[in-house]
């Protein structure tokens, strides 16, 4: 882990491991006849965040033993009514980058607020990222993530001297 300077602010670079998620963001399920992210994107676009260039799924990156907290995200969309299958949800987004096998991909930390998403437990050591499709990536792969410490607090993180 290290602090790196990018443009006008600092980013924190964290090592992570790609984990399997609930799989509702990326594919249809018995409760959802579509991927949830595919259904949510038009709502986010109408609110000012265009995610259409990105893959219709999320990377679930474990940063254990660290934990993250979305503190001052670039975007927060309160109580988005994107489906009639459950109550409205609040979502926050913070720009990020992921690195895999020497390539860098821009994207967004995607944070469905757990207080409005009662049916899913949100692991505070698992960061969900929306980015471009990454060829060849598999569960268990090492993947680095850069996050903005002005928007996301990393609990247990100590910058290198």
What are these regions (language model features)?
Residues 150-161:
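Short, Lys/Arg- and Gly-enriched loop/turn segments at beta-strand edges
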